[in-house]
Structure formats: structure tokens, C-alpha cells
Amino acid sequence: MTYRIHYEVRGTLSFLSHLEIMRLWQRAMLRCHLPIAWSQGFNPRPKLSLGPARNVGVEGLSEYLDAEFSESVRAEEVMSKLNEVLPDGVKVLDLRELAPGSKMLEAVINEAMYKITFLQGLPEDAKEKIAAFLAAEQCLYLRQSPKGEKEIDLRSYVLGIEIVGDSMFLAVKTGSTGSLRVAEFLTVLGYWDIIKDIKIQRISLFVTEGAKRNTP
């Protein structure tokens, strides 16, 4: 049986990388002695699958993990045992059993919602800059990586932006085709210099099909 675990990552643990979060979950499963299923081969691993990678330093308020178990176990037991051993900053919110043959998280999640809060107040030019960004056909950005430089179109990933008070709500495409990094978006807006005064949270992940938008 497989459970889809809905959880959050807050505070200093948001600075853990995708790989470090996976290791955290592996250790938690072992510590609470749940009957997790293991892969076959020379280097067996717990059968766990995370949703789309979250950028380091970005809190995740609605994250997902698929966990396969070798025998039946009650949802209440899984949630209770995990929350007993997980460190402060990571918490299971709820979980549900998946039907056999369900697609993996990375294959179905295709939209993310971010909340970008300006702790010193929304810049006076924010609305003007957002309007210009949305009106543009392209917004090319040179992304640096260990493999070299790659030019990407940030505008093509953005589905919508809404300003509420001192916060921006940014809806973006995500999934196997990639996504933008919020730090890149803030850089092209000219806000990199005040990044330390900006709080970034990934508040939702969605499965979007046409006009329908559902949680995983």
C-alpha cells in the first residue's frame, strides 16, 4: 500500500536541499519502525518519492511525499509515529491511501503557488514592474549551473501574479519541463539587493487540467 503524505517545512529546515529532505524522511521512517517497502538490488532504499524540488531557503507549507509500505498500516498510526520523530519545522498535516497504479507526484504536479512577502513593505514600483513583466512576451534570464550557462524564458513559466498588501502571490508552471526560481524572478524585477528582507513560501502545489485545479 502507498500513502500520499501532506506535510510542511518551516523555519531553518527550509534551508535543507531536496536530497537532505529525502534523507530526513528516510531516517524518520526507520526511527518509528513503520513497515516501509524497500527497493531491490545491491543498494536497497526505502520506497519514497518527493514532489517537485523546493528551492533552498523557501518554506514549503503544502508539500507531498509518496511512501510505499510492505504491509497494511493505519493512516492514523503513520501520522502519529512520524510526527513524534520528525524535527521541529517538519510536520505531517494529513495523508491518504493511493489507488494501485497511481502516477508519481512529479508526473502529476504541474503548478505551484508562491507567497512573496516584503518584510519592509511593498516597494513603490512593484505594481508597475509586475504590469510590465506580465505585458512582456518574453523575459530572458541567463541561469548559472555546474553544467554551464543556460538562457531561459522566465515569462513562459508565470501563470499569474496578484498583489495583496505587502505580498505577491506568484503562480508558476512546474514539473518535468522545469520551472523558474523565485530568486530569479525577483532578480529580473530588480529586488535582489533587498532579498534578505523578503520571505518566500511555496504555499500550494496543484494538478491542473484545463480549467480544473486540484491538490495532489
What are the functions of these language-model segments?
Residues A37-F69, A99:
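Short, charge-patterned binding micro-sites
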Residues L61-K115:
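Ordered, amphipathic secondary-structure segments that act as subunit-interaction surfaces
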Residues E77-L86, A126-A135, E184-L186:
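Short amphipathic alpha-helices in soluble, non-transmembrane regions
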Residues A135-P216:
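Core RNA-modification/binding signature centered on pseudouridine synthases
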